[in-house]
Amino acid sequence: MELKRPFKIFGTDGIRGRANKSPMVPEIALALGRAAGQLLSRLGKSRVVIGKDTRLSCYVFENALIAGLCSMGVDTLMVGPLPTPGVAFITRAYRADAGIVISASHNPYYDNGIKLFDSQGFKLPDSWEAEMEAMIAKNHFDEELPADDDIGKNTKIIDADGRYIEFVKATFPRKISLKNLKIVLDCANGAGYKVAPLVFKELDATVFTCGVTPNGLNINSQCGSMHPETAQKAVIDNRADVGIALDGDADRVVMIDENAQIVDGDTMLAICARDMFKQKLLKNNRVVGTVMSNLGFIKAMECLGVEVIKSQVGDRYVIQDMLKYDANLGGEQSGHVIFLDHNTTGDGLVCALQVLRIMIETDSKLSDLASFVQRYPQTCLNIKVSSKPSLDSIERLKEVIAQVEEILGNSGRVLVRYSGTENTCRVMVEGPKYKQVIQLANQIADIVQEEIGLSVS
């Protein structure tokens, strides 16, 4: 049966929403599996890797996707809970035709999402997603079903964890170890809860873990990169050298220095860029950040003579610009850091290991490395919105933004944008004085709230 209205389910990071509420319902997951299978049938007999995080609802969508794919003649390879970058790696390692991750990343347990990779582990282009949306809207899959002897089969990959662990460890030099480091590791009760502790323990670190007891309902709950205060406290309590906080699917990381201070994606990106620049490993002396990158990061790169490309917010756009501008390092403030020499997506474990390597090779504390970036005061307010009209169409908003930009001049920035995965408007203001930044951000947020908002968080 053809759907009666325009059908848009993909956002900037695949499909995402409240579990058991459209679009995150099993019927759409089944149809998505069939649509993906129909596209892949053009390649002949195909195989798809399917991974997930630890949300209770993952079982629902995993089974629906497998049913949809197999019904279209596609073989599926299940890896169970595994970080998103691990699924991208396994997709390449098995020479599969695509990979699927069931995860809502840093969101609470009651949300879920589905994102797809191509055979190289890159997220699918917008054109593929649009074609699948059109197929799902028409819902004419019965006409394309294969004969009964061509139905796909489902197989469990039992060594996916071990393969990914060895892949991650291979990005760390054999000549050094983590023997003298005490590390706090917060896995957010998410996809990294099994593999992440083993990576650091096998490299001989002393590891204090938290967020490693998922129950389906506690992913990202007061733990992980969205709640670094848990790792900060553990660093203090255990007198650790460093803290590592992953998000729910372990594609992003926030680090904590020995003084329990947060080291975010911008600073980690700068640390790694400087190291790669010195070793002549930074391709074209270029790094990709985003429009949200802190001005302190931009100025630190300028001092090095490193060009900064500013992409849209979202790791898929960072990666697109890395490919477009021939860069091998990119990332965003939230903790997605992409090393294209190692993987095709953000990888929290790989990023953390690169920073630890630099600490060891330079005999530096993380706080010393982080001091390279003199961060500008910055705030970001999130306003829940009832709709997403063009921001340019809201005259009062345009006026207040212009006023704030005039006040800041060349010493600050304003960025107002909609989230690609939530019904949220984000207001970012950056400038030389923290109190002024907060005041100006609130002025803009108040107008957003009055015009289209529900509540400010």
Swiss-Prot record:
Binds 1 Mg(2+) ion per subunit. The active site is at S105 (phosphoserine intermediate). This is Phosphoglucosamine mutase. It comes from the Bacteria. Mg(2+) binds at S105, D247, D249, D251. Catalyzes the conversion of glucosamine-6-phosphate to glucosamine-1-phosphate. GO terms for cellular component: cytosol. CDD domains: GlmM. GO terms for molecular function: magnesium ion binding; phosphoglucosamine mutase activity; phosphomannomutase activity. Its cofactor is Mg(2+). It is an enzyme of class 5 (isomerase). InterPro entries: A-D-PHexomutase_a/b/a-I (IPR005844), A-D-PHexomutase_a/b/a-I/II/III (IPR016055), A-D-PHexomutase_a/b/a-II (IPR005845), A-D-PHexomutase_a/b/a-III (IPR005846), A-D-PHexomutase_C (IPR005843), A-D-PHexomutase_C_sf (IPR036900), A-D-PHexomutase_CS (IPR016066), Alpha-D-phosphohexomutase_SF (IPR005841). The gene is glmM. Belongs to the phosphohexose mutase family. Its EC number is 5.4.2.10. Keywords: Isomerase, Magnesium, Metal-binding, Phosphoprotein. Activated by phosphorylation. Pfam families: PGM_PMM_I, PGM_PMM_II, PGM_PMM_III, PGM_PMM_IV. GO terms for biological process: carbohydrate metabolic process; peptidoglycan biosynthetic process; UDP-N-acetylglucosamine biosynthetic process. The modification Phosphoserine is found at S105. It catalyses: alpha-D-glucosamine 1-phosphate = D-glucosamine 6-phosphate. It comes from Protochlamydia amoebophila (strain UWE25).
